[in-house]
């Protein structure tokens, strides 16, 4: 086995591209990659608004955010010569101007400023889950992937789908590869929204299939997506999954209910909030009213341990 290791680039620069609308950001992504950036990451308006309410991000946002954009695309270039990377930022500005976006780039050449920008982006899930109230961004379609030429139309159709079911979605992450982390905002304590979860998932996967995309472009396809493998892979491949599982794990001890013979993704017994869920009435001794009570503050947790 040969590992093709590469040295870590000596320098990095970052262009924070501001767009009036989410759709324009998605439409422009396919052109940004022509500059061969190392990353193009999306930060949507919802994430910016939520981050602006969190003290640890407020000062950071002021240093790279201009006005109230509909979305940001963070475009990073890396290499050995800083002068060449600065030229890339110039080309980035010129490219956006040709598409009608003048003075749209905040340049981050100072590593400290770059870190502050990435701190906001890398806290994306934590920021999204800080949404107050029972409705939360729900993981079910969060790593579908499509070609960049289809990205604007695909995301537009998903927003129409969310509107059809009386909700909205949150968006962030890997625009450069057409794999955005999108989550519909639902209250899974309610049976009605649990039904919406399934409907949105099924209809989204049908849309993804139209574009010959992937229903699981990054995160894996366990409890939520295994049920839909036949739609994406076909019966023959799914049968092969079952044969391999039977050979190596005949008693189904390893990760039961995932990939092979899965449960329904909307089985509420598997939910964080099951059908019988009731919040605990805890007298905390502290004032949690800003969060709607101590139990609501606890429910903001997304279990990733970043705090």
What spans do the regions from the language model cover?
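Noncatalytic alpha-helical scaffold of FAD-dependent oxidoreductases
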Residues: 1-173, 178-217, 222-307
């Amino acid at each position: 086995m040969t590992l093709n290791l590469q040295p870590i680039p000596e320098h990095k620069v970052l262009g924070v591209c501001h767009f009036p609308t989410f759709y324009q950001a998605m439409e422009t992504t396919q052109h940004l990659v022509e500059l061969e950036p190392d990353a193009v990451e999306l930060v949507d308006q919802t994430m910016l608004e939520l981050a602006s309410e969190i003290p640890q991000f407020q000062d950071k946002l002021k240093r790279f955010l201009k006005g109230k954009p509909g979305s940001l695309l963070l475009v990073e270039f890396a290499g050995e010569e800083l002068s060449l990377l600065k030229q890339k930022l110039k080309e980035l500005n010129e490219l956006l101007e040709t598409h009608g976006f003048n003075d749209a780039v905040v340049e981050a050449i100072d590593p400290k400023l770059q870190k502050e920008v990435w701190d906001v982006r890398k806290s994306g899930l934590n920021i999204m889950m800080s949404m107050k109230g029972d409705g939360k961004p729900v993981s079910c379609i969060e790593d579908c992937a499509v070609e960049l030429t289809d990205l604007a139309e695909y995301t537009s159709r998903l927003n129409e789908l969310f509107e059809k079911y009386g909700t909205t979605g949150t968006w962030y992450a890997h625009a450069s590869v057409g794999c955005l982390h999108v989550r519909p905002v639902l209250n899974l304590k309610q049976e009605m929204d649990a039904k919406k979860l399934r409907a949105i998932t099924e209809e989204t996967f049908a849309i993804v299939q139209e574009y010959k995309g992937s229903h699981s472009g990054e995160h894996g396809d366990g409890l939520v997506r295994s049920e839909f493998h036949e739609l994406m892979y076909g019966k023959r491949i799914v049968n092969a999954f079952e044969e391999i599982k039977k050979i190596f794990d005949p008693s189904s001890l390893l990760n039961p209910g995932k990939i092979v013979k899965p449960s329904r993704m909307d089985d509420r017994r598997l939910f964080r909030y099951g059908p019988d869920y009731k919040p605990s009435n805890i007298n905390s001794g502290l004032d949690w009213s800003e969060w709607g009570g101590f139990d609501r503050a606890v429910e903001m947790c997304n279990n990733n341990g970043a705090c």
